[in-house]
Every structure is written in structure tokens, then in C-alpha cells.
């Protein structure tokens, strides 16, 4: 598939998965704009894309802050962004719900749900006016299979699936396609943190926590960043896909 001539905006662009998305989309021909809160992380990701022969600009933005998103939209007003990848997300606490502080709950929803709403609100109008565009929201398999001791995160991803389906119905008739991608546990720094916190909570070893997560998948393993990125590109090559969610979890499906 070619994305030549299209501009893709990726939130959470300084993280490992954002970087993988950038590499895959640039390889498909897209111009990439990486958005995130960490300037150095964004610069490192942009350099990686450039080394692979792609093009990636960066812009600092806090997607949970309406003013920051408004400034970003004004900054990129002439960029003709036709692909929005809402990848920014926070993992939140690893504790039973009764031990979660209200501020921790709010922090998770501020990025994982409110951030997606704010980005869509800012960048959908030009797509609607042009009669074309794609939005891919990065959800999680935990939005379909509850993850114990991760209630804020699980609830936020369930909310994101609902947002995706509803928004697809609103803007699909205007030529804009909205879908979501639900990875399982992706190998990398975020899951390493989750394994450590799970081990501390349950009293097991970090290695045992990782084995437990992997055992929940039919393939018995975690998902790799490049697998998720390739799935994103594949989704964009399916013109009939709208209001859908693609599960990329190595078979970590919801129990019957």
C-alpha cells in the first residue's frame, strides 16, 4: 500500500510504539508529524525515521490540555493532515480500584479518552471539509477483556472503543473513516513497568508476571511493536473497514 502524498499525525510519537508507527507509515510513503510531551524523545524518534529514509517532523503538545491542542491545530493548519493516529496513552496505577486515588483515575482518562476527543475535535473539521481522511485510535485488548488491578486503564480503553464506533457513524457519511486497533501486551518499557508493579502487588517475581501475561495469549507470547505498526498500515489498505476494531494480541481474546 502507498500513502504517498498523505500527512500522518501521530500522538504519543516519542514512545516506542509511536516510533514504530512512524517508521511504518513513512515506509509506506506518508509524511509524518510526531506529537508528544517530551521534546528529546520526539527528536530521537524523528532521527530514527530519517535514518530509515523517511520524513518526520515533530511538535510538542499535551493532548489532555485543550489550549495545547488548539495551538497545535493552528500550528499545523496548512499541513493537510489526512491521517490521525491517536496513540498517546498512559498505563495508570496497578492496584485494586479501592486503592486508586481520584487524581490517578482522572490522569488516565485525561489522556486516554479526553485526549482522543480533543484531537478529533481539532483535526476532524478539515478532513470533513475535504471529504476524506482516516482516524485510527489505539485502544487495547483490555478494553474487551478486563484486566484485574488495572481498572482505570481498562475502563478508559472500553470508553475509547465506544468513542470509535460512535464517531465512525457520525463522520463516515462525510468521507472520514474511523477505526481502532487493539494491541495485547506489547513488549517494551511500558510492559516492563507493568510486570514490575504486578510482581510487587502479588508477591511473584517479575519473570513470573511476564509469563502469566504471555500465557493468556493463544500464541503464548507478547506482541512486538513492529507487528502493531504493520497492522496499522494493513488497516489503512482496507477501504471497507469503518467503525471496526482490529485485535492484535497474539490471541488474547475475551473468554466466551
Regions found by a protein language model. Give the residues of each.
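Conserved glycine-rich cofactor-binding loop
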Residues: 7, 14-15
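Substrate-binding pocket helix/loop in short-chain dehydrogenase/reductase
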Residues: 81, 95-97, 104-109, 213
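Short C-terminal tail/terminal secondary-structure segment
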Residues: 94, 145, 237-256
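C-terminal substrate-recognition "lid" of short-chain dehydrogenase/reductases
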Residues: 117, 221-248
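Active-site helix of classical SDR
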Residues: 120, 156, 164
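Alpha-helical segment proximal to the catalytic Tyr-Lys
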Residues: 125, 169-170
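Residue(s) in the substrate-gating loop at a strand-loop-helix junction
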Residues: 140
